[in-house]
């Protein structure tokens, strides 16, 4: 087993604190509308310029192992806030730095670390409750635009395009962000269910101009296995031919004789049939096939449930108003299902979203809900250079997450004002003893720090701004972008309550751990002597 280095008590905490401050000082300069840029060196290509706190935090690894432990713990705060609410990473880092600095000063002066932690936890719980009381619902387009604009570093164009996307696909709709080709941002909405599988043969193409297959009012046959023998398909093909309607076959794969016969029938005009592979892989494929079955009021022909392809009937086929297939995608519009069947399926998937812990699985399930609900919006980012494109895409991702969080838990006054007001309201909060009271004061002082940092980044005197804001009424605050004081809600400076809540909770959590740390252990690194 490798030798270890061990540090105890104040020596350990001071090393850890140095790492915390190194990371937090690099991240906090990006906070607010006048936040500064940070340039990140890359091992290849041009440097990246960013104002995204979590991007800065992810880049930092320190040489000293003990200092690095402190930095990594604060990095975890930023990542957790990002995972929970998709934004608020810089706020969480600023809060954590203040909690830890003030908390460790109290420990150094002889306070009981456990009581300090209890005091911090008590103040945090009370603040979260106040946040819930303060939050106002965010449902209209203008509020969503304002939240998106603030999160995208006061870029109103980004806020507007996100609000428009949400209006078109609904709150549960999937909105994806891609790199565009031009200089302007573009929004496109794909109606119906789309999945990334194209036609299996170019001979199926019906629209030669754009190279796509267009089927009007087709039957849809869903099969969960490979089809290579035409004998299995013949009975259902004959039934479809009698009905004079076209047919879309979605199967695990269609190859050999079966595919060749479909192509020949298509070219001769006997049966207008087109084949595509089923979307997804493994269990996800089965789930998506079931989704398509629900949407089109059909049945998945599966031997697992005793259904054979040779015995398939027209009643087991789904149908839709229109299907468009390109070489890469298939879009089903106007499935024949009743609204109640789709609603039941969506409710079932939403229950899975609540129980799953994997973010990847959540995203996949959310996409399935959106496809069933009828829409996917794609925001294409326009920029002049690759560096600008990356920076802008980061901001749009942040803004998108922030607007979702705002719709979920409501909005509060932005610019660090909500936490500053809460700190003022909780001034009389008391713990069970003097050390807990110090912990409460540490937490209340930390809650003012985001406002102070926003003012500092804007070139203003932090204490003057903080005192002026505390002297005002409920939503009175400071607009760092213009240098004006006023009602933050009316000025459109809003923060999602969920972002503020998660930033505070995660910062308090990691601060409690650091304050109560008494020893640090890391692998010993021996200095290698140079051979001369």
From Swiss-Prot:
It catalyses: ATP + H2O + a folded polypeptide = ADP + phosphate + an unfolded polypeptide. It is found in: Cytoplasm. Gene3D superfamilies: GroEL, GroEL-like equatorial domain, TCP-1-like chaperonin intermediate domain. GO terms for molecular function: ATP binding; ATP-dependent protein folding chaperone; isomerase activity; unfolded protein binding. Keywords: ATP-binding, Chaperone, Cytoplasm, Isomerase, Nucleotide-binding. Pfam families: Cpn60_TCP1 (PF00118). CDD domains: GroEL (cd03344). The keyword Chaperone applies. ATP binds at residues 30-33, 51, 87-91, 415, 479-481, 495. It is an enzyme of class 5 (isomerase). Its main location: cytoplasm. Its EC number is 5.6.1.7. GO terms for biological process: protein refolding. GO terms for cellular component: cytoplasm. Forms a cylinder of 14 subunits composed of two heptameric rings stacked back-to-back. Interacts with the co-chaperonin GroES. Together with its co-chaperonin GroES, plays an essential role in assisting protein folding. The GroEL-GroES system forms a nano-cage that allows encapsulation of the non-native substrate proteins and provides a physical environment optimized to promote and accelerate protein folding. NCBIfam families: GroEL, PRK00013.1, PRK12849.1, PRK12850.1, PRK12851.1. Belongs to the chaperonin (HSP60) family. This is Chaperonin GroEL 2.
């Amino acid at each position: 087993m490798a030798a270890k280095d061990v540090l105890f008590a104040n020596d350990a905490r001071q090393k850890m604190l140095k790492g915390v401050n190194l990371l937090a000082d690099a991240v906090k300069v990006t906070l607010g509308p006048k936040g500064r840029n940070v340039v990140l060196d890359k091992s290849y290509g041009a440097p990246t310029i960013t104002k995204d706190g979590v991007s800065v935090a992810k880049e930092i690894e320190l040489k000293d192992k003990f200092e690095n432990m402190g930095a990594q713990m604060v990095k975890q705060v930023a990542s957790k806030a990002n995972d929970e609410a998709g934004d608020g990473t810089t706020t969480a880092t600023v809060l954590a730095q203040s909690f830890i600095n003030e908390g460790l000063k109290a420990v150094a002066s002889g306070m009981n670390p456990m009581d300090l932690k209890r005091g911090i936890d008590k103040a945090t719980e009370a603040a979260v409750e106040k946040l819930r009381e303060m939050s106002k619902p965010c449902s209209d387009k203008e509020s969503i635009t304002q939240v998106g604009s603030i999160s995208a570093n006061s870029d109103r164009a980004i806020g507007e395009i996100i609000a428009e996307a949400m209006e078109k696909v609904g709150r549960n709709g999937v909105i994806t962000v891609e790199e565009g080709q031009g200089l302007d941002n573009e929004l496109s909405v794909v109606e119906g269910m789309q999945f990334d599988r194209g036609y299996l043969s170019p001979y199926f193409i019906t629209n030669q101009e754009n190279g796509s297959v267009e089927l009007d009012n087709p039957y849809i046959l869903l099969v969960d296995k490979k089809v290579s023998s035409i004998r299995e398909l013949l009975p259902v093909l004959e039934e479809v031919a009698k009905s004079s309607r076209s047919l879309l076959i979605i199967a695990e794969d269609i190859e050999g004789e079966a595919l060749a016969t479909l192509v020949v029938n298509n070219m001769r005009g006997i049966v207008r049939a087109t084949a595509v592979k089923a979307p997804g892989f493994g269990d996800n494929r089965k789930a998506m096939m079931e989704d398509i079955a629900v949407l089109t009021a059909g049945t998945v022909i599966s031997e697992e449930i005793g259904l054979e392809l040779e015995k398939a009937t027209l009643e087991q086929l789904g149908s839709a108003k229109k299907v468009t297939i390109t070489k890469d995608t298939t879009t089903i519009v106007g499935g024949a299902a009743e609204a109640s069947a789709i609603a039941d399926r969506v409710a079932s998937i939403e229950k899975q979203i609540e129980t799953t812990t994997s973010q990847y699985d959540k995203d996949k399930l959310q996409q399935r809900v959106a496809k069933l609900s009828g829409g996917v919006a794609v925001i294409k980012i326009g920029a002049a250079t690759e560096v600008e494109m990356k920076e802008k895409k980061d901001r749009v991702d942040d803004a998108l997450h922030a607007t979702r969080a705002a719709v979920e838990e409501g909005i509060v006054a932005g610019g660090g004002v909500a936490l500053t007001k809460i700190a003022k309201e909780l001034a009389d909060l008391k713990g069970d003893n003097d050390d807990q009271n110090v912990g409460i004061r540490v937490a209340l002082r930390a809650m003012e720090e985001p406002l102070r940092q926003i003012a500092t980044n804007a070139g203003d005197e932090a204490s003057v701004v903080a005192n002026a804001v505390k002297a005002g009424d409920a939503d009175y605050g400071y607009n760092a972008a213009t240098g004006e004081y006023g009602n933050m809600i009316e000025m459109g400076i809003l923060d999602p309550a969920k972002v503020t809540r998660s930033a505070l909770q995660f910062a308090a959590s990691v601060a409690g751990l650091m304050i109560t740390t008494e020893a640090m252990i890391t692998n010993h690194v021996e200095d290698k002597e140079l051979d001369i």
